[in-house]
Amino acid sequence: MRKRFFVGIFAINLLVGCQANYIRDVQGGTVAPSSSSKLTGISVQ
């Protein structure tokens, strides 16, 4: 049960990170890295 909980958190973090990257791409890459991308550990290039 505990393993499923951690997998769920990981999936949510992944979705949030991908959504932040998508929004940044749509707006031309002018958006500064948000706190959500830092929390998920996604490096912004």
Curated annotation (Swiss-Prot):
One of its GO terms (cellular component) is cell outer membrane. The keyword Heme does not apply. It is a lipid-anchor. One of its GO terms (biological process) is cytolysis. InterPro entries: Lysis_col (IPR003059). It is found in: Cell outer membrane. PROSITE patterns: PROKAR_LIPOPROTEIN. Keywords: Cell outer membrane, Lipoprotein, Membrane, Palmitate, Plasmid, Signal. A lipid is attached at residue 18 (S-diacylglycerol cysteine). Residues 1-17 form the signal peptide. The keyword Signal applies. Lysis proteins are required for both colicin release and partial cell lysis. This is Lysis protein for colicin E1*.
